[in-house]
Amino acid sequence: MIDIILNDSGGTIMESLELRIFREVARTKSISKSAENMGYVQSNITAHIKKLERELNTTLFIRHSKGVTLTKDGEKLLYQAEKIISLLDKTLKSFQNHPKTLKIGTTQTIAGYLLPQCIIEYQKQFPNVLLSVSTLDQDDLEQKLSNGQLDCIITNNSHNICYGKQILNSPENLVLITPSSCHSQKDIWKYPVIINSIESCPYRKVLLGWWNLHQSELPKMIELDTVEAILNTVAMGGGISLLPQVVLLDKQNINSFYIESLQSTSIHMWVATDKLPSEYIALKDIIQKQLKIDNN
């Protein structure tokens, strides 16, 4: 990297490379030794020193048979060069140490069952990336993606997002969950339907749509805010619900039924239109791999 030092009027005075070469020559008192240390040919070192002397309109070194010695102006420049180079190096280091952030938006359900293992795996591969996960409803996710507050969103809503690029579309297995006392699909209809209180929730839409295809009367509905609340209520005999199969791992007092006529859902990953999709391929691959594991 070559840093440019400007004067007050914006004109170029010198490049930091010239200052670094000047400092090395001042330290070694030798053009040849400086060239060796910095990996340049001697003529290149000499050319940079002469260019610097022309820009400053002064002589910086006295040449003699044993090497070079700083002039008074050379000593003055060395003092300033040390400070300038130190400041440039600190500035560069501060940017290099500034952690890259990845701001992810998703639904509460996906954040709870899919992302934890994916985040662990991503951090193993990219330990210097700071991850931030926000759980929002679908409308808020799209809005924050469009205004730059999120880098990518992971959702199971299938409609297109005009200001995003889709890089993942992978199916998820859904199952109808019932209390353990429900041993047959014929018994399902006697239970209340437990759904997420957010109307845009895909599982809610699929479950109610399926119910309305098979029953003339609307179900008794219980609306809850969290997946955990839905699971606990089903386990205690309070009703039936629809959730991804993986959510049921190690859950007791719950039966599950796979019903072919239920409309499926998919996990979609969208990145903002001003982002490079290639930067998010690693996260996409991890999510896709985890979905394959979960769906088996």
Predicted regions and their residues:
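Short helix-boundary/capping micro-motifs
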Residues: 23-41
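Central regulatory/effector-binding core of bacterial HTH transcription factors
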Residues: 99-161, 223-224
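A late-sequence structural motif
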Residues: 259-296
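Secondary-structure junction motif
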Residues: 192-214
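Acidic, Gly/Pro-rich loop/turn segments at junctions of secondary structure
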Residues: 136-191, 246-251
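Alpha-helical linker/hinge and terminal dimerization helices associated
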Residues: 55-56, 77-98
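Hydrophobic hinge/microswitch elements
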Residues: 137-138, 156, 208, 213-260
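A short LG(V/I)-centered, amphipathic sequence patch enriched
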Residues: 22, 53-70
